[in-house]
């Protein structure tokens, strides 16, 4: 346990505390709030804070509007092609947002496909991808599945008898949804909205790709990379990002604590089978929503096969040379990506399983603190953790490298591991809860030590969850 504490403290807790300390201290090391006063005195930072808050809320609102119809249809109806619909609805999570931004520029940008058509037909253009609107559009199309997936689970867990009783008393249609269904599904909807908000304000690649820098995440990145690591304003911006994340977490928890959402008993979920014209209408609605959400994928697919695509509705020429370039002439891009992600995933599985085992199978003091530190990256924006790594490890030589840790590929693996650790901890915890302790006790009674019991009994049974 001490080893796990040391790892999590070194690579999660200490970098974040280091960022906080620099923002709250002066040149002599004394605590001060002068840096935050200077932050609010500067119009650039005030506008960046306001834009970040507004963009995060707008992404949540538009993601909710896109997700609710899809979630309700998926959770409440059975029809041909439902599995295909569910799969297509989660595809936006496959590509990073900044990749989607590149593709959307070719479809909705100033000289993109849609604006070329508008110019041809109506002699006008619409600035879909300009400024904050473009950032909100890209992030909405990428992050809405977080709300969708959580809302589907919440809708499926609602006791059908609650709605049946309301219908027997004359409550139907939208009134039924507003008075009964919506309040009961709020926990899942709020959880998805919270995750969407945090991911939206944390997103660095999309604003930079769209050349919109007046948000907190780009400002933190630019201050540290252009002015330097000694620029206090960059650390203050990072603390402002952390503050927004924590406030959103507390607000969601407070809101959900105002009411009771549990039911005493729950019947099996009831779905209605659609046939005939109703299936066509459902696919018409879902097809329109998913068609918009999959625009980045369509654009990136066309771009990958194009040789030239500029100021035309579609690529003028197509080629497989782009794939040949990546696969045969520059394969190190793919090799490095696979190597780093596989190493990070392997480390996450080891650390996540070990932490979950300590949480469930031990009574050691401090295990709850260990869980809190391991879960911290969910609330800490990635750019804040990256800035903390630069500050802490820039002058620290990694054993065997002979160079600072931040100048080697090792720091990427560590960052990926720590950033995604909460997911493997929670997955391991859930899987381990399904393994009865009597199975481990039986192995130990036959002479196996705890390590052998974990490797031979526990680990194979939780592999599916991992």
Where are the regions that the model predicts?
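Juxtamembrane interface elements at the cytosolic ends of transmembrane helices
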Residues: 162, 216, 247-265, 297
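Short alpha-helical segment that forms part of, or immediately flanks, the ligand-binding pocket
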Residues: 163, 440-441
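Alpha-helical residues within the helix-turn-helix
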Residues: 167, 222, 444
């Amino acid at each position: 346990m001490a080893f796990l504490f040391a790892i999590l403290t070194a690579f999660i807790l200490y970098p974040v505390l280091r960022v906080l300390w620099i923002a709250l201290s002066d040149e002599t090391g004394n605590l001060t709030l002068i840096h935050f006063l200077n932050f609010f005195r500067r119009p650039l930072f005030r506008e960046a804070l306001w834009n970040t808050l507004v963009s995060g809320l707008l992404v949540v609102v538009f993601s909710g509007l896109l997700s609710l119809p899809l979630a309700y249809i998926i959770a409440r109806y059975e029809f041909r092609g439902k599995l295909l619909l569910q799969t297509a609805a989660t595809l936006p999570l496959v590509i990073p947002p900044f990749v989607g931004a590149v593709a959307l520029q070719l479809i909705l940008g100033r000289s993109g496909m849609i604006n070329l058509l508008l110019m041809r037909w109506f002699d006008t253009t619409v600035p879909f991808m300009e400024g904050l609107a473009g950032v909100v559009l890209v992030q909405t199309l990428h992050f809405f599945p977080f709300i969708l997936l959580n809302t589907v689970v919440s809708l499926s867990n609602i006791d059908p008898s609650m709605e049946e009783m309301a219908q027997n008393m004359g409550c139907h249609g939208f009134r039924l949804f507003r008075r009964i269904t919506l309040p009961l599904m709020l926990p899942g909807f709020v959880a998805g909205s919270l995750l969407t908000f945090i991911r939206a304000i944390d997103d660095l690649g999309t604003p930079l790709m769209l050349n919109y820098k007046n948000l907190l995440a780009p400002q933190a990145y630019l201050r540290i990379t252009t002015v330097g690591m000694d620029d206090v304003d960059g650390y203050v911006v990072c603390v402002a990002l952390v503050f927004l994340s924590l406030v959103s977490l507390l607000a969601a928890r407070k809101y959900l604590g105002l009411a009771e959402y549990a039911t005493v008993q729950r019947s099996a979920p009831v779905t209605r089978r659609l046939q005939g014209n109703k299936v066509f209408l459902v696919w018409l609605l879902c097809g329109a929503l998913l068609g918009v959400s999959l625009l980045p994928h369509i654009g990136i697919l066309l771009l990958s096969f194009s040789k030239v695509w500029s100021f035309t509705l579609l690529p003028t020429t197509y080629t497989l040379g782009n794939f040949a370039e990546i696969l045969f002439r520059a394969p190190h891009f793919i090799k490095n990506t696979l190597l780093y992600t596989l190493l990070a995933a392997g480390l996450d599985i080891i650390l996540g399983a070990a932490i979950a085992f300590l949480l469930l199978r031990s009574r050691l003091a401090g295990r709850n603190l260990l869980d809190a530190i391991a879960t911290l990256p969910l609330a800490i924006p990635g750019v804040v953790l990256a800035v903390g790594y630069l500050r802490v490890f820039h002058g620290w030589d990694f054993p065997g490298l002979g160079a600072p840790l931040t100048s080697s590929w090792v720091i990427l693996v560590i960052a990926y591991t720590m950033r995604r650790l909460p997911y493997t901890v929670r997955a391991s915890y859930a899987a381990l809860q399904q393994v009865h302790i009597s199975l481990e006790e039986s192995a130990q009674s036959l002479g196996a030590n705890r390590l052998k019991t974990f490797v031979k009994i526990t680990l194979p049974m939780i592999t599916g969850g991992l």
